[in-house]
């Protein structure tokens, strides 16, 4: 079905808007999936906060032009589904990784983040990226550790003095 020029411009504008606020992107070949499987993937994407769209490659190239995801332009070949992570950088990769476990026909082609293009072998690394909350918790633990150690050291001084006095009292 041919799209009118107005429809194409609307699609490019919508995808460009989503790309401008995305943290990472992933593209996958969806050939061989049934309609029910694609519907399931779309539902999972909505639940995990991932923008998912099947878009023509030329329109996707226009949408990513001038963004940090322009590195994906040469990788857009064949029927692909585009996933954009908006809240956490690993969300699209986690979605694709979990979906790929049960659907052999689904094949991740490329991933992109911060202007760099990655192959499908990096899918596990992307999927393991911590969420914002997990990263902040780790940072707080790292910052808190030296302070906790310092406080324990300060508390140890009076304890040692009490033990010395108790030992002297016991010896007399």
Curated annotation (Swiss-Prot):
Keyword annotations: Ribonucleoprotein, Ribosomal protein, RNA-binding, rRNA-binding
Cellular component per GO, a single term: ribonucleoprotein complex
Keyword hit for Nucleotide-binding: no
Highest taxon in the source lineage: Bacteria
One GO biological process term: translation
Pfam families the record matches: Ribosomal_L10
Membrane-spanning intervals of the chain: none
GO MF term (any one): large ribosomal subunit rRNA binding
Subunit structure: Part of the ribosomal stalk of the 50S ribosomal subunit. The N-terminus interacts with L11 and the large rRNA to form the base of the stalk. The C-terminus forms an elongated spine to which L12 dimers bind in a sequential fashion forming a multimeric L10(L12)X complex.
NCBIfam families: PRK00099.1-1
Function as written in the Swiss-Prot or TrEMBL entry: Forms part of the ribosomal stalk, playing a central role in the interaction of the ribosome with GTP-bound translation factors.
Similarity comment text for this entry: Belongs to the universal ribosomal protein uL10 family.
Record's protein name: Large ribosomal subunit protein uL10
Organism, scientific name: Francisella tularensis subsp. tularensis (strain SCHU S4 / Schu 4)
């Amino acid at each position: 079905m041919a799209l009118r020029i107005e429809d194409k411009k609307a699609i490019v504008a919508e995808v460009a808007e989503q790309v401008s606020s995305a943290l990472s992107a992933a593209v996958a070949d969806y050939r061989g999936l049934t309609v029910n499987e694609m519907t399931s993937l779309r539902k999972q994407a909505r639940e995990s906060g991932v923008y998912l769209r099947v878009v023509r490659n030329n329109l996707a190239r226009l949408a990513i032009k001038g963004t940090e995801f322009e590195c994906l332009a040469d990788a857009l070949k064949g029927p692909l589904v585009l996933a954009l992570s908006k809240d956490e950088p690993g969300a699209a990769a986690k979605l694709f990784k979990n979906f790929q476990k049960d659907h052999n026909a689904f094949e991740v082609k490329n991933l992109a983040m911060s202007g760099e293009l990655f192959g499908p072998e990096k899918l596990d690394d992307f999927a393991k990226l911590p969420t914002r909350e997990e990263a902040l918790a780790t940072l707080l633990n790292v910052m808190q550790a030296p302070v906790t150690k310092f406080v324990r050291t300060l508390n140890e001084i009076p304890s040692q003095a009490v033990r010395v006095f108790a030992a002297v009292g016991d010896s007399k």
